[in-house]
Amino acid sequence: MLLPRRIQHCRVCGAPTVYRMPADDNRERAVCSACGEIHYENPLNVVGTVPVWGDQVLLCRRAIEPRHGLWTLPAGFMELGESTADGALRETVEEAGAKVEMQALFSVISVVRVGQVHLFYRARMLDTSLDPGPESLEARLFREDEVPWDELAFRTVRQTLEWFFEDRRLGSFSVHTGDIA
């Protein structure tokens, strides 16, 4: 079970918070000891793409922790003020320097243990020029039989790629959902 993030100070006035169950609620929340503001701790969204060029998918080798040196789809935390698709596109540009046309939402995976929801969109690469950013050691295209399956950074990436290649074999893409405890 996830240990919740602990909010220690009010985001409104800066006073210390205490954890208690507010009226008409069913769980403990961080409540400001001075102004009474209730602070909710919610999952973080990770957004990314499955960029495709012909029969190949684009993967990035991580230059940062966690999982430094392992391969992943271009993805990262969604920012305030952007849609999930906009965030996925931004991350694809930041991590791989890839130019893509965004397509449909492809997978939504809840990672309960760390309080995250991972959303991946299919994306069609417009060309093969790549310019990996500071969070990537390199970016490369892989056919299914070339994917470094034992060197993938995250279970959500493996699951998304497995679904993608299966759907491609079937000739029809759908939205996939799942949970990782």
Please describe what each predicted stretch is:
Residues L2-G48:
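Acidic, metal-coordinating catalytic segment for phosphate/diphosphate chemistry
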Residues R20-M21, K99-F106:
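A short coil-to-beta-strand element that immediately follows conserved catalytic motifs
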Residues V52-E94:
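Conserved Nudix-box catalytic region and its N-terminal flanking loop in Nudix hydrolases
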Residues I109-P132, R140, T160, F165-R168:
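Active-site-adjacent beta-strand/loop module that shapes the phosphate/pyrophosphate-binding cleft
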Residues R168-A181:
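Charged phosphate-binding loop/patch that engages nucleotide di/tri-phosphates or the phosphate backbone
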